[in-house]
Amino acid sequence: MRVLHFYKTYYPDSVGGIEQVIRQLCVGTTRLGVNNTVLSLSRQKDLAPIQFDGHSVVRMPLNFEIASNACSIQALGALARMAREADVVHYHFPWPFMDLAHFMARVDKPTVVSYHSDIVRQKRWLRLYQPLKHRFLASVDSIVAASPNYLESSSVLARYRDKTRVITYGLDKSTYPGVDPCRLAHWRERVGPKFFLFVGVLRYYKGLHILLEAAKGLDYPIVIVGTGPEETALKEQAARLGLKHVLFTGALEEEDKTALLNLAYGLAFPSHLRSEAFGISLLEGAMYGKPMISCEIGTGTTYINIDGETGLVVPPSDPQALRGALRTLWENPELARDMGARAEARYQALFTSEQMAAGYTALYQELVAKRAPAKADAGVGLVDVPPAR
């Protein structure tokens, strides 16, 4: 079976939560016999196709942007051409240009949309985009939400409940670098033996300005890994508040990130807006057995982190509540250890890449069978899928 994924950006050009989901999905479904290709846009000059983790990556030039919406004239032809060769076209939403490209390329193959997030911030543009968005979502064969929380709370998905299902994101720990003793020693010396960790792109909805406000009056080390649009403002805020115990590391290699995930006392994830639909770095914390602190925003973050069980969940945009959660975990190491152990157990039960891959491969098969029952009867394009645990 051949699956074409379409998203605005991907490895090696960018590293983010959705890119990690697509990567894990491709790695997992490849093991089940799926041939994956990712079509994305890039600003790089060298756009030769590459192989990455066992799947193909094809990049088209990013020509221009409208309200942060990446566009490519060449991608229209590429999508039309590559869709003809695919058994299933897998779209990753939101990306308004993708909706337009779907119609302009006249894609006539089984289609699935991974609905990664509502569009939250661009209110003015959203009004103009609404008709295209709903025409696109109505036209595809299946929509997938990453958590029951998001499916229940999204007003957009409520219109498409009859063709929407939940397949949770999953991670494969074996795809992460192993523990490097030298890097562990380096970071232990640099940040100390006990610290809270945040990992992610420094965006407006990550709530890091709230975390910095919560850190005022505490002396607990907090390590913030990543870069992004809010980096300068956050560093200025930390300096203004005199937060000498907060370390901004910038972008790090995966080996360093893994070392910090191994060493961290707990994971702080203060995202306060629905743009944070799931939280891959929160799931990474669970995978590494860390107690978590997150906010209740009606999304997948509270499906990963169960208040009082795997960590603490506080109201969004509430520095005092966040400060209290940091203090509770810091002052109760036995509680933190127990929560971390339960977080890892929940990851193993619900969030492995094997489960995600099995769910999506079964969906691909279902879509192909509905579109071409004769081929399905002959076994063309289908693979055997083990039952999800």
Language-model features: locations:
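Short hydrophobic beta-strand element within catalytic cores of glycosyltransferases
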Residues: 287, 291-295
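Conserved acidic donor-binding segment of nucleotide-sugar-dependent glycosyltransferases
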Residues: 306-308, 312-319, 328-333
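Short His-centered aromatic/hydrophobic patch
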Residues: 91-98
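A short, active-site helix/loop in glycosyltransferases that binds the activated sugar's phosphate group
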Residues: 138-178
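N-terminal strand-loop element at the rim of the active site
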Residues: 6-15, 21-69
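A conserved mid-protein helix/loop that constitutes part of the nucleotide-sugar donor-binding site
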Residues: 20, 194-217, 229-235, 358
